[in-house]
């Protein structure tokens, strides 16, 4: 079945599985980058505790770079899918070209921050000179060579928008394999390579990202034949850029709020470096689980957006139904794994002094995965149906308005010695439940205003 016919005619439940599995694998592999780095760094012969703390502190900026790249890609994905659904190949070419122009701008900003801003950023979270030095070295490399992750994110969404998610997964697998192979070689110094420690982890990561980006660029040029390619389509078009970010900005803010949340949580936990490190390690495991929901969301959005462009009420309704069902199944699986094997993850990271804090965080925060996954699915549905404001509100509730004040208040009791650090972890499930209830109200309203009116 041709790609365009597949988006129009294949049963939505089968289409979502066919598109969703490669996207889920792609997102899971994206989370592997950070897990693998931490696992190898945690097993360094010397300085592993400081190195793990350093990776925890740099993680918010890594997330922010990914946020801007993926968010721009999400906007491109939905707009491109809708434009192709309307049969407008000329505009589709401009949408793709403008997304690449935006990628260049994003890289320049990351490059400047990598040169001038990383030391001040790391210094705000620690006074330990060893942690500071490691954090600056790692983050500077990731920022200066960030073009790999930025353009990978864009080409991934361009392929997904045309139903070719399998090829984006192939690119992700190649990058992950390159990263995993290079990590021990560059971190520990194997063969002719000198021992580089955390710098080696950074170089392994960015080389893997560049490999993925190059491969997806080739796939994009060779396979996306529904619209033309060329530098002329990169000429900035204010209207198209506005349309991209009308959809993508909420996704950027959602991802950026995750970065802000982790940064502020690092500040809240600054009184206990072991708990701070434990939270950073757990967050990488949490990302692995929630990226399953993000991957499925990236199938939900183009499927529903394409159906919305066709004005197909039934396919939109099926997209919502199966998107939520499949998300719930994935999140239950994630909860089971993290609740049953917390000790195994702690051993993988060689968590040391942070081990008990890490296991405690996993036991409590994992409860929130079900509601967090549903919230992610809601946001994918909103984005497909022009519900950018609703998506933004859910992000603000989950990452800022509820979680941070709640964790801050709970930390006061912990610092006063009235209760253990585990109280802070309970802020996460409480937040996700509240956001999920609000999200359900939004979903009912959007269905009434955008879907039920279709014939």
What are these regions (language model features)?
Residues 23, 27, 39, 78, ...:
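Transmembrane alpha-helix boundary and packing residues in multipass membrane permease domains
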């Amino acid at each position: 079945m041709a790609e365009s016919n597949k988006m129009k005619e294949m049963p939505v439940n089968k289409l979502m599985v066919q598109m969703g599995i490669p996207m889920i694998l792609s997102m899971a592999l994206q989370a592997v980058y950070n897990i693998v780095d931490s696992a190898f760094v945690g097993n360094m012969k010397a300085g592993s505790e400081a190195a793990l703390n350093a990776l925890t502190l740099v993680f918010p900026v890594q997330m922010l770079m990914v946020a801007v790249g993926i968010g721009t890609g999400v906007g491109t994905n939905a707009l491109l899918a809708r434009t192709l659904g309307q049969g407008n190949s000329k505009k589709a070419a401009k949408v793709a070209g403008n997304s690449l122009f935006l990628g260049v701008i994003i890289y320049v900003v990351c490059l400047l921050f990598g040169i001038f801003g990383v030391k001040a950023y790391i210094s705000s979270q620690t006074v330990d000179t060893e942690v500071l030095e490691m954090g600056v070295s790692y983050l500077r490399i990731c920022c200066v060579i960030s073009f790999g992750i930025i353009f990978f994110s864009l080409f991934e969404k361009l392929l997904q928008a045309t139903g070719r998610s399998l090829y984006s997964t192939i690119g992700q697998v190649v990058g992950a394999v390159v990263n995993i192979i290079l990590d021990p070689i560059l971190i520990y110094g194997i063969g002719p390579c000198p021992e580089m420690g955390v710098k080696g982890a950074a170089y392994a990561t960015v080389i893997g990202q560049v490999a993925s980006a190059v491969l997806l660029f080739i796939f994009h040029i060779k396979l996306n034949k529904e619209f033309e390619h060329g530098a002329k389509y990169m000429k900035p078009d204010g209207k198209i850029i506005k349309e991209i970010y009308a959809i993508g900005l909420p996704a950027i803010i959602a991802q950026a709020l995750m970065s802000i949340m982790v940064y502020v949580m690092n500040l809240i936990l600054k009184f206990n470096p072991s708990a701070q490190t434990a939270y950073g390690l757990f967050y990488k495991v949490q990302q692995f689980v929630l990226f399953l929901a993000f991957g499925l969301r990236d199938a939900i959005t183009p499927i529903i957006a394409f159906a919305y462009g066709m004005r197909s009420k039934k396919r939109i309704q099926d997209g919502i139904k199966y998107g939520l069902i499949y998300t719930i199944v994935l999140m239950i699986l994630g909860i089971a794994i993290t609740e049953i094997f917390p000790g195994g993850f702690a051993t993988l990271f060689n968590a040391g002094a942070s081990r008990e804090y890490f296991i405690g965080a996993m036991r409590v925060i994992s409860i929130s995965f079900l509601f967090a996954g549903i919230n992610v699915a809601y946001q994918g549905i909103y984005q497909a149906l022009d519900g950018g404001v609703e998506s933004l509100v859910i992000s603000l509730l989950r990452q800022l308005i509820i979680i941070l004040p709640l964790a801050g208040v709970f930390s006061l009791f912990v610092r006063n010695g009235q209760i253990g650090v585990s109280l802070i972890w309970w802020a996460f499930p409480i937040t996700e439940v509240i956001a999920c209830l609000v999200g359900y109200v939004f979903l009912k309203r959007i269905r009434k205003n955008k879907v039920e009116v279709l014939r």
